Design a protein with these regions (language model features):
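N-terminal glycine-/charge-rich "phosphate-binding" loop or analogous flexible N-terminal tail
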Residues: 1-58
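Short, polar loop motifs at secondary-structure junctions
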Residues: 11-14, 63-68, 85-86, 178-185
Length: 197
């Protein structure tokens, strides 16, 4: 395996650092950035900020760095973002033409769909109003609430996030109408899917 220089800005703990180093023996790693872990905060090490020298040194970057720091670096062979969106990195002059750019599409669908469902329930059930009333001991109606069951939910974008959200709404008894950019068969969790024109 060829030796590479990898800059890792994804929050990692000692266990994951060791796994990366075992998976790529001979590679030199620099771990930088915000170093907090939701799943294992006891493993988090104090984070060091990413510097321009780190970015210029790297042949591989795992994680997100400010696009302005890349400036078409010829040394950078691969940028793997820890986000689905890569808009900042596809602008002219950010990456050299032969730099491989990959993203984390598919990594956040479940988590974001559950958050969206929580927000939908908060709005439909007026949960924030009832929470505030409970704190003040005022038990009065906050007006009519809605149910997801029997509602029609329109989902714009039926990719990973939209699909996961649609599936959860369907499981709660909603009629789901999806909109997507490319033609595909209607998934079982949607009643209708239309193309964006």
């Amino acid at each position: 395996m060829n030796e590479k220089r990898a800059l890792v800005t994804i929050p990692t703990g000692e266990r994951h650092r060791n796994l990366l180093q075992q998976a790529a023996p001979g590679w030199e790693f620099r771990f930088r950035g915000t170093d907090t872990l939701v799943c294992a905060p006891q493993e988090a090490l104090p984070g060091q900020p990413v510097t321009q020298e780190d970015v210029d040194w790297a042949q591989v970057i795992l994680g997100n760095v400010p696009a302005a720091m890349l400036h078409g670096s010829p040394a950078l062979e691969w940028l793997q973002t820890n986000s689905a969106g890569v808009e900042a990195y596809i602008q002219p002059g950010v990456l050299a033409g032969d730099t491989l750019l990959t993203n984390a599409t598919g990594a956040y669908g479940l988590a974001i769909a559950e958050h969206m469902l929580g927000m939908l329930l908060e709005l439909f059930k007026k949960l924030e109003l009832y929470r505030d009333a409970q704190k003040s001991g005022a038990w009065q109606s906050q007006g009519a609430v809605k149910a997801v069951y029997g509602s029609t939910v329109l989902v714009l974008g039926m990719g990973d996030i939209g699909g996961e959200f649609a599936a959860r709404c369907k499981a709660l008894g909603a009629k789901v109408i999806g909109v997507r950019r490319s033609p595909r068969p209607c998934p079982e969790y949607a009643d209708e899917v239309h193309l964006l024109e």
